Amino acid sequence: DDCIVVEYYIVTDSAFTKRFKSNSALTKYVTVMFTGVQNLMDTLELGIGVRLLGVTAFNEETEPSFIIDNLISGPPEAFDPDVLITAMSEYYCNHQIGLAKNTDLIFLITARGMGDPREDGTVDINTAGIANSAGVYKPCLKAGVATDDSDYNERVDTLAHESVHLLGSPHDGEGPDQVSLEGSPGAANCPAKAGYIMGNRNDKNKYKFSPCTKKCVEYLLSKPAASCIFEQCSGF
């Protein structure tokens, strides 16, 4: 029997990396996040497992061009999310080696903020994460970004929310035109106010995905191109 396993490769920017005393402390922290992501994915009831393949913690000397070249000095230092996701996607499109090549999804975790640049050089910090729609099995579109503000629930939600964009779901209340996958059912039938993870989260439903999100992800998984997410079941 086949199992659905979404594999992740995590890279961290220098601002995030320097919060930790050691690489092992950072890796442990990220691993704990994935326990939370798995718990949220379980609410899709599609049997999706998440697996962390590895973590690369960049420091100020090793940060790649897609981070350095797009940093807005602020203060505080921040990114324009649209510019960052485009540059990151292109970078990994051109650097398909090792874990970056083998993984289903690549996420940057940043401790810097994201938002709209203002004319005075500062940034209106208003974006927790961004990801390419239905990009999971496309080598040049399998990227996402999540900001980490040290609140466990917030960052786990962001990672799960952005992952599900990559797995073919729009926000609740959005139609199929918001999904980069032909034939997607979209999520227009699930209003944002119902309060699920892909809507405006309320206390009742903020740790669950809506029925529409489930249908959208199920649709993506039914496509032949999604076969890379399926593997032989082991004692996973």
From Swiss-Prot:
PROSITE patterns: ADAM_MEPRO
Residue ranges the record marks as coiled coil: none
Binding residues for Zn(2+): 161, 165, 171
Named cofactor requirement(s): Zn(2+)
Post-translational changes noted in the entry: Contains several disulfide bonds.
Keywords of the record: Calcium, Disulfide bond, Hydrolase, Metal-binding, Metalloprotease, Protease, Secreted, Toxin, Zinc
Localization of this protein: Secreted
Source domain of life: Eukaryota
Cofactor, free-text remark: Binds 1 zinc ion per subunit.
GO terms for cellular component: extracellular region
Stretches assigned to the Peptidase M12B domain: 4-232
The protein's Enzyme Commission number: 3.4.24.-
Listed Gene3D superfamilies: Collagenase (Catalytic Domain)
Keyword Plastid (UniProt): no
Control of this protein's activity: Inhibited by EDTA.
Catalytic residues identified in the record: 162
Stated family: Belongs to the venom metalloproteinase (M12B) family.
Biological role stated in the UniProt entry: Acts as a metalloprotease. Penetrates intact tissue and specifically cleaves the vesicle-associated membrane protein 2 (VAMP2) (part of the SNARE complex) involved in pancreatic secretion, thus disrupting the normal vesicular traffic.
Protein name: Venom metalloproteinase antarease-like TfasMP_A
